[in-house]
């Protein structure tokens, strides 16, 4: 059994910000103590940073740091202090389930299968992508179909080519950023398909990604069917209102159809719709944020509140002794 008064699940932007904020507040409230020893961060990847590690485009930190940073640069603003903080960090460790007795089941190469006891749990586990398979498009499921996150990881982290001619489903920020990335990689983006009557995402991204590179956007439409054996050959695009269809020949389909907060570790809790007061959510697992700066702000407040609750408990115990 591992004991950690404050346990944080997720070492991305939210997890690091919450951990650093909690450590700072504990140092203020419990001077002379080892604040870092009170906090443990679990991360399923080998390094902290989360999705920021695959974001090489600019647009981060405009609010938090008044600087136009890449995702990697934004991450480094926290990764350095986090590494030097003395906060316990367990990489390559997956959180499986939290229990009512304030324990969490985890598994990793350093810990094996173990239980971690905590006083306060901060869930900073981000989101997972809604897959193309969750949609009702007919046809085959050949290779060449990716979620936006998968495509971004393969291009930016693995330096892999995923195709030559792409159609992107979803005009939110992620879809727009991937469209630009494909163009910069020397590929063709034949169309961005959007089910709504207006383009999604931030105006800045629309201007910098779609309008600047003259990428066609087809509104009020969806992908009705997929074609190809072995490799994607094309898609049929259908207008939602008129049902008019158009075939587009392509070898790559990138699906950017939404994010779902990752809360499955809490599946055994909150059966009545309310979570115990010893659990906090922050970042994209709380709700999907438009920018990482607001993720950081919320996470810092969450970490501070958890530290104050822990310090109050410790000081109350000392006064009763």
Which positions does each model-derived feature cover?
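Residues forming the flavin
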Residues: 1-321
